[in-house]
């Protein structure tokens, strides 16, 4: 880096070298030896900025530097050289004009943003404080850092507190192209009504696909092996001139997996319940998933054409899950339907549109497209294929998009019927070709100005987005629950309860919910009979919940998923223990207590000094026992003079594990040789005890 001499800089600034030398010392804490000394060009730029800011204060400069003491001038002339160093003395006063400027800066900027590290000089400039003040505070903090040395974020944060300035971590601008576009377009108020996105959920064999088939008026079920949905699809239907987009349910796992990734794509859930079967375990799971995601539910009571169908019984069961039908005074829409005879289908769709109208779903189609990946796969003939749900804007063939850490230019676009289309608007599902890699379901996509921008963002995201996503939500565990409550990270403790019998679930739910207090609310989001499954872990991960199992164990898949997702799974055989552990965690009682246990006492009766070994004490065990490698304290005249560990323990010439009461032994103390006859060696151990009572 180039350097500049003092006299050259003074000439540029049109001031004397003497004034410049004094300015450097008093304003920047930099001591130079004489006019031939050199400084870095970047430091010279700072000085120029300072002079320019004060150029209309010429009288101030003249008054300050015209009467420069002779002794100071002499000091600068001594030991001529070319070095520059930070002055390590504390200045007695600061220039009034600079103070006024600093006060103004601090009033206007109480917050500054920095990256992971910052140099001391850059930090000084950011907060508008003289470098000497910053270095002085660092020294008080025990950090010895020169002007160009870097400090980390935590140090900068503490340093900012010294100046009453909040230091924030600057988010890495890897999505600059996307962010700029969003800022420009978010101001656009040209929004219009968009179709609702509906997911169909329910228990196996309750007729989800048949209902969707009836709605679409096409025989999808007949083409699928065993009547089981083989793929995740998205379809659009039209009723009374209005569109509804259906996601052919990916099942509860994918529903919650998407939500765990931050992708909320469903506006309304149609919950399918068979009239002749009632609420089943997967139905209950679906209800809990919807509640956790805060998605409105429209209940379709299916198979009303079958003998044994009992609509009222289903409605009664729904009330147990706080879903009270409208005709019973509640706010849950329940529509009896038959996928077979198509009875009630139109009414169901009208109710979906009514629910959507209440939600006031809006989007702006006159902007660049963005949305979520519903499914993606690698096709041998076509490459990476992704089904996208456009949530805002319009997407067209030829557009460049960024999808998670993948990018591409749309080569072809197909609608839900497989027809080629050129563009699509909000709430419309499309299948696209042209991505560089297969994205993950739940990834967000954004349209950007060109493929180069998309590629640059994707490359940066590949380095950071995955780890940031995994770290974005800190999973709750009993061990650190108290700390998270205190830090304000946890306001609500979500719990999933699995047990061997229904009675145990009810008992646990009631007891756990009674633990709620002002700081944290305990909420049982799901309870079911049976082993802990991968589905439970997925829900726990999405809802940041703890899983409690009573007389049940997680299966191998659930264990692997829990480890991968950092979900806390606790199993118990006694309900009381589960309640006490949650209670203890909430008040911070899972931190262990330590208790000292006295093992024994021995009196030193003879001293042996052995070269290369040290001092050996011949002892008589008066109480308890002496144990090899145990902790000991040396007591002389009732006063503890040293604490250490037993280095060795012998009886006669043999090493022994312990010496019992009434026996003699020889021992040596780790790192201590100043023992005397009559000293007492007290052996003890530290036991860890977990508190179980509040």
Swiss-Prot record:
Domain of life: Bacteria
Domain tr-type G intervals: 193-362
Region (G2), start-end ranges: 227-231
Gene3D superfamilies xrefs: 1.10.10.2480, P-loop containing nucleotide triphosphate hydrolases, Translation factors, Translation initiation factor IF- 2, domain 3
Chief subcellular location: cytoplasm
Signal sequence residues: none
Region (G5): 338-340
Region G4, annotated ranges: 302-305
Subcellular location: Cytoplasm
Record InterPro entries: EF-G-like_DII (IPR053905), IF2_II (IPR044145), IF2_N (IPR006847), P-loop_NTPase (IPR027417), Small_GTP-bd (IPR005225), T_Tr_GTP-bd_dom (IPR000795), TF_IF2_bacterial-like (IPR000178), TIF_IF2 (IPR015760)
Pfam families: EF-G_D2, GTP_EFTU, IF-2, IF2_N
Binding site for GTP: 202-209, 248-252, 302-305
Keyword line: Cytoplasm, GTP-binding, Initiation factor, Nucleotide-binding, Protein biosynthesis
Region described as G1: spans on this chain: 202-209
MF-aspect GO terms: GTP binding; GTPase activity; translation initiation factor activity
One Gene Ontology cellular component annotation held by this UniProt entry: cytosol
Region (G3): 248-251
CDD domains on file: IF2_eIF5B, IF2_mtIF2_II, mtIF2_IVc
Function: One of the essential components for the initiation of protein synthesis. Protects formylmethionyl-tRNA from spontaneous hydrolysis and promotes its binding to the 30S ribosomal subunits. Also involved in the hydrolysis of GTP during the formation of the 70S ribosomal complex.
Family: Belongs to the TRAFAC class translation factor GTPase superfamily. Classic translation factor GTPase family. IF-2 subfamily.
Protein name per UniProt: Translation initiation factor IF-2
Naturally occurring in which organism (per UniProt): Clostridium kluyveri (strain ATCC 8527 / DSM 555 / NBRC 12016 / NCIMB 10680 / K1)
Gene name for this UniProt entry: infB
